[in-house]
Structure formats: structure tokens, C-alpha cells
UniProtKB/Swiss-Prot annotation:
GN (gene name): gpsA
Entry function: Catalyzes the reduction of the glycolytic intermediate dihydroxyacetone phosphate (DHAP) to sn-glycerol 3-phosphate (G3P), the key precursor for phospholipid synthesis.
Binding site for NADPH: W11, R30, R31, K95, A127, R241, V265, E267
Organism: Helicobacter pylori (strain P12)
Localization: Cytoplasm
Family under the similarity heading: Belongs to the NAD-dependent glycerol-3-phosphate dehydrogenase family.
The protein's name: Glycerol-3-phosphate dehydrogenase [NAD(P)+]
PROSITE patterns from the UniProt entry: NAD_G3PDH
GO BP term (any one): carbohydrate metabolic process
PANTHER family, per the entry: GLYCEROL-3-PHOSPHATE DEHYDROGENASE, GLYCEROL-3-PHOSPHATE DEHYDROGENASE [NAD(+)] 2, CHLOROPLASTIC
Length: 312
């Protein structure tokens, strides 16, 4: 089975490595991946698997299954340029909300791909741990459970992949946890203690579920791997880009400086603004996201965090 992974960032390379254990994988990226792929391919070859091959777009389109790991803010443009077949079997691994149109990932994708051919990856995982072959459990959300299981069966021995429906719940959980993760980084950076952190995360989970329920997301999704699992991982680890953004803000660094030092995309920054705008439009109560949006715009970090804890 040949799988094409679109996106050469850390997440795309990690997924290429994961799927490479059982399948032939082609990766498509504008950047030269020769050096980043060397160590991954050495590990795959040692397992008796085929190495990942970087190819151009046209060669990638010949694959049977597609995995997309493109930043959400560029996803619509990518679909427009890639011209995937309408019935392509697609697993989208991007998490976030499009700021320009305030659109969920599934809303973007269905403009280009048959909804029955779409799957969405969710759950707690870090690229750095996947490329080490460390175990994790993920969820593949899709209205087409047969397709979700097809993707699940292609995952490596160290990943337990579950097939579930509730696309909207899974993608909102995956986007919203990045917002709470920034707040978690601020909390730890200010050394507010374990009690404050527990309050923040538990109320963050409630807020995430409230927002998701408005759009039809199921409570069990937010209490499972896609929601609580991903939230607790992302909001507690230095491996999380969004958590590191929070740590930087806690040092009173301007957001622009924090992002420059990060050198990578932290989807939670733009997702925060998108969530606040959507919440305002529909009258959804989102105190943590709303306070974080003010912090990102320059509000004092101590004042913002104190207000956040009191309000949440």
C-alpha cells in the first residue's frame, strides 16, 4: 500500500515515519528533506521497512491514501493548488480553525473532497515521541467508519488507533486544546502552583466541551483521547509549541518575540482569535479563550492570568 504524506514539517515527517512501518510512503514538501529523513529512514530500514521517499506533487497523487499535515491557515490554498481527486481517500492531521473565514477544518476540506472520503486525526501525540517509536493512542474521526478503519490498520505497532465518528467534536477538541495549552504555559511560567493549574485545565475542558456542544460535538469525545487526552498532554509539556508560547508570555516577552524564538507554527495563537470571534457571534461563553485573546493583544500577563483564574 502506498501512502502520500503532504507536509514536510515535524508533524508530517513523524506521520511519514509512523505509516512507513507497514507501507510505502512518499512525502511531498517544498523544502529539501534529504537530511531530516536520513535518521528516520535508517530506523525504518533496520525494521525491514521501505525508506520514505520525497517526491513531487504529481508523483504523490498516484498514491492510494493521502495524509495531509499542512498548517490550517494555509490549508484552503493548498487544496486549491493540489487539485486532489474529489474521491481521494484523505486523512487530515491538521488541527486548528481558519481565521480568515472562521472555518473548521472539515468545512474547508468538504469544499474539495467528498465528505465520505474524509478522515480527521485527533488525540494526544508529539512528533518527537512518534519518531522515537514511543507508544500512543490516537483517534481517526470519520463518517465513513470503513475508511477510518482502513487508515487505522495502516498505523504502526506502537500506535493504537481508534475509529470514531463525531468529526466536529474531534476537530474542535484538537483546535481548542492548543488555546488552553498556551494558558497552561503561562500558568506554569508564573509558578502559580499545581492547584491553579488543575483549576485551569478542568475549567478549560468544560469550556472546550461547551463550545463544541454548540456545534453538535459529543461529550464523550471531549472526555476521551481527542479532548481530555490531547489537552492534558499539550498543556503540560515543553514539547508543545503552544505551551512554550505561554512560557514565553509569562516572561513578559512580546508575542512577536516569542513566536520568532519559537521558529515554528503554534496554531493556538490564531485559533484563539478565531474561537473568540465565533463565540461572540453565537453567544457562547468562553472566558479562558477570551482572556487569552486579550493577553495575546498585550494585556499584562499577571493581570490577565489573575482575571482568568477568577473568571474560570
Amino acid at each position: 500500500m502506498e501512502i502520500a504524506v503532504f507536509g514536510g514539517g515535524a508533524w508530517g515527517r513523524a506521520l511519514a515515519f509512523a505509516f512507513g512501518e507497514k507501507n510505502e510512503v512518499k512525502i511531498i514538501s517544498r523544502r529539501d528533506l534529504n537530511e531530516p529523513l536520513k535518521k528516520l529512514n535508517d530506523a525504518l530500514i533496520s525494521k525491514g521497512s521501505a525508506p520514505i521517499e520525497q517526491v513531487d506533487l504529481q508523483r504523490g497523487l498516484k498514491a492510494t491514501l493521502y495524509v495531509i499535515a499542512i498548517s490550517v491557515q494555509h490549508l484552503r490554498e493548498w487544496f486549491q493548488n493540489a487539485s486532489l481527486p474529489k474521491n481521494a481517500k484523505v486523512l487530515i492531521a491538521s488541527k486548528g480553525i481558519e481565521v480568515l473565514n472562521r472555518a473548521f477544518v472539515s468545512e474547508i476540506a468538504k469544499d474539495f473532497i467528498d465528505p465520505n472520503s474524509l478522515c480527521f486525526l485527533a488525540g494526544p501525540s508529539f512528533a518527537a515521541e512518534i519518531i522515537q517509536g514511543l507508544p500512543c493512542a490516537l483517534v481517526i474521526h470519520s463518517n465513513n467508519q470503513a475508511l477510518a478503519l482502513e487508515f487505522a490498520n495502516k498505523t504502526p505497532s506502537f500506535i493504537r488507533a481508534y475509529a470514531q465518528q463525531d468529526i466536529i467534536g474531534g476537530e474542535i477538541a484538537g483546535a481548542y486544546k492548543n488555546v488552553i495549552a498556551i494558558a497552561g504555559g503561562v500558568c506554569d511560567g508564573l509558578k502559580l502552583g499545581n492547584s491553579a493549574k488543575a483549576s485551569l485545565l478542568s475549567r478549560g475542558l468544560v469550556e472546550m466541551q461547551r463550545f463544541g456542544a454548540f456545534f453538535g460535538g459529543k461529550t464523550e469525545t471531549f472526555l476521551g483521547l481527542s479532548g481530555a487526552g490531547d489537552l492534558f498532554l499539550t498543556a503540560n509539556s515543553i514539547l508543545s509549541r503552544n505551551y512554550r508560547v505561554g512560557l514565553g508570555l509569562a516572561q513578559n516577552k512580546p508575542l512577536e518575540v516569542v513566536l520568532e524564538e519559537l521558529g515554528e507554527v503554534a496554531e493556538g495563537v490564531k485559533t484563539t482569535n478565531a474561537i473568540v470571534e465565533i463565540a461572540r457571534k453565537y453567544g457562547i461563553y468562553t472566558p479562558i479563550a477570551s482572556e487569552l485573546a486579550l493577553l495575546l493583544k498585550g494585556k499584562s500577563v499577571l493581570e490577565s492570568m489573575n482575571d482568568l483564574i477568577r473568571r474560570a
